[in-house]
Swiss-Prot record:
Pfam families: Ribosomal_L6 (PF00347)
Gene giving rise to this polypeptide: rplF
Keywords: Ribonucleoprotein, Ribosomal protein, RNA-binding, rRNA-binding
Gene Ontology biological process terms in this record: cytoplasmic translation
Protein name: Large ribosomal subunit protein uL6
Length: 177
């Protein structure tokens, strides 16, 4: 049995938590995040900490409580520190630029690729081959990074494409004659 739910989530100073039934709203310096929790989870806010437990009558109560604890911990970290995700473009002529809330990509297609960023996510390009995504919602940051990577995934022979900064691309050997 996992014991993730047994550890409380510490709520730092400057973070406001509102519990309205199963809807939890966490507000901090980086914004406001809201999440609806599973009915099997019971949340209590006391002494600058959130504690989690299962409700009676649910077989998967502890599992859902552990999931809820992990999600709310990510929300607290997001509204205090924020999350970043870095992408690299590898390939001749592969370039990225940010104009407002649109990421412009040149990925070897016959047309440029424009990706609209969702609300709460900012992007910057320190160089033409790097993209840095920042925001408070961990799930949305990961989804935007996955969407950008999906335009041109790293191919296995030369490794060209859009990759995460910490991703290791396994390359294959070329066909032997």
């Amino acid at each position: 049995m996992s014991r993730v739910a047994k550890a409380p989530v510490v709520v730092p100073a400057g973070v406001d938590v509102k519990i309205n039934g199963q809807v939890i709203t966490i507000k901090g310096k980086n914004g406001e995040l809201t999440r609806t929790l599973n009915d099997a989870v019971e949340v209590k806010h006391a002494d600058n900490a959130l504690t989690f437990g299962p409700r009676d009558g649910y077989a998967d109560g502890w599992a859902q409580a552990g999931t809820a604890r992990a999600l709310l911990n990510s929300m607290v970290i997001g509204v205090t520190e924020g999350f970043t995700k870095k992408l690299q473009l590898v390939g001749v002529g592969y370039r990225a630029a940010v104009k407002g809330n649109v990421v412009n990509l040149a990925l070897g297609f016959s047309h440029p690729v424009d990706h609209q960023l969702p609300a709460g996510i900012t992007a910057e390009c320190p160089t033409q081959t790097e993209i840095v995504l920042k925001g408070a919602d961990k799930q949305v940051i990961g989804q935007v990074a996955a969407d950008l990577r999906a335009y041109r995934r790293p191919e296995p022979y030369k490794g060209k494409g859009v990759r995460y900064a910490d991703e290791v691309v396994r390359t294959k050997e070329a066909k032997k004659k």
